[in-house]
Every structure is written in C-alpha cells, then in structure tokens.
Amino acid sequence: MLSTAFKSLGLDHFLDHLNGHARRLIFGNMINAIGMGLTMTLFLVYLNTIRGFSGGFSGLVMSYMAVFAMVINPLIGILIDKYGGRIVLIFGLFIKAVGVFSLAFVQSKPQVIAVATILAIGDAANWPAQTVCLTRMVEEEARQKVFAFNFMALNLGIGIGGILSALIVTAGELSTYQRLYWMDSITYLIYAAFAISLPVWAGQRLNKEDKQSGSYREVFKNKELMKLSRA
C-alpha cells in the first residue's frame, strides 16, 4: 500500500533504499502521524475551551511536557542501549496510547498534569527509539534519504490528520473532541503492532564489543550541536 502510493507520486527512488522492515516501520509511523494530526493543533483549544482551564495553565502544561521529556531523555538513551530500540519503542507507544486515551477524560488540574507526564514519557521514548530502529535497518549510505523519506511520511500523515479533524470536530461539543483522542490512541496501538512485528535485531542493544566509550561531556563540548540546540 505504501509502496504503491509513493510510486504513484514518483518517489520510488526513496523506496529502493528501504527493505520490508523499514517500510513497515515508516508506514506505521505515518498511520500514527494521522492520529497526531487529529489532535495536535487542538490541544490548547481542548483544555481551554472544552475543559475550561485557563489559557495560562494550558500553555504551562505544554511547556511542562517539553521540559519533562527533555529531562528524562538521557534515561531513555540508557534504556535503548540496554534493551534495544524496538523494546523501548513498543513501550513508549503503549504508554502514549494510554496517555492520549486518558486525555479525553481529564476534569481537574492534577489529572491534566498526570496525563501530561504520561504523554511526555511516551514522546521522550518514541522518537529516539524509532530512530535507532530505522538506523539499524538501512545501510549507512542510504540513511539520509531514508530519514528524509520518514519525515516526509510523518508530515503527510499529520496533514491528513489535520484535515480529518476539521471534518470531525464540532466547536464546543465535548464528545467530538473525545472521539479524536480515542482515534489518536488507536493509531498508537496500530504503530505498536507494526513495531512488535519487526525482527528483534531491528533495535538490538549494543554488544559489549561494540560499545564505545563516551559521555555527555563530549556532547556538550560539540559547539555545532550546542548552537543547533539553542536555535
């Protein structure tokens, strides 16, 4: 299905670099991106207009999620090194599915913060774990094109989801927003099914002989990376 769609768009030269496992991962990611597109742009509207929280609190929740995900990111890296990207990705997708589903029922600030924490954990796990899996499944010289293709599929999915959400949601009607979050949570489960179907080696942990020395001190010394992070 994915191959036919992109070949019709003249993008078959990207597909030449993808084996069946990588295509499966990217297709699962695109389905999940459709779910994200359903809810991504409506998060503040949902909390503020539908649930009645102030705009300041709603914005603070978004900032909290970003900061919390950044803080636990080193821990996610350790887990990926220890257990492999595939396992962490599956875990993150199930966590995110629970968080998104729960968001449809929040009624108090503590509930919002609790759900936001779950969502942040899922976000922190999913992207780096997916990146590791994709890296292991394609040849080094093809990675730039493969990652570009993955981003393109991601953006396409988000765009489709945004269009669908505009057709589904009704202003001021709680049930239509809840429906969007339920649909979004299902796409995470679908993506998790794709991830489970991947071979174990797709995100295998590093062997002791492959493990290289290094620390975050070396990362912080990379001036180009720090400039990019500040930007």
Describe these PLM feature segments.
Residues 87-102, 185:
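Structural signature of the two symmetry-related core transmembrane helices
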Residues 9-67, 226-231:
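Helix-loop boundary and gating motifs at the non-cytosolic
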Residues 104-116:
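Helix-loop junctions at membrane interfaces in 12-TM secondary transporters
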Residues 49, 160-180:
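Transmembrane alpha-helix termini and helix-breaking/packing motifs in multi-pass membrane transporters
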Residues 117-154:
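Cytoplasmic helix-loop-helix junction between adjacent transmembrane helices
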Residues 186-206:
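C-terminal membrane-cytosol helix-exit motif in multi-pass small-molecule transporters
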Residues 66-74, 159:
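Residue-level signature of mid-helix packing/kink "hotspots" within the transmembrane helices
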Residues 1-22, 200-231:
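Juxtamembrane intracellular "pre-TM" segments in multi-pass secondary transporters
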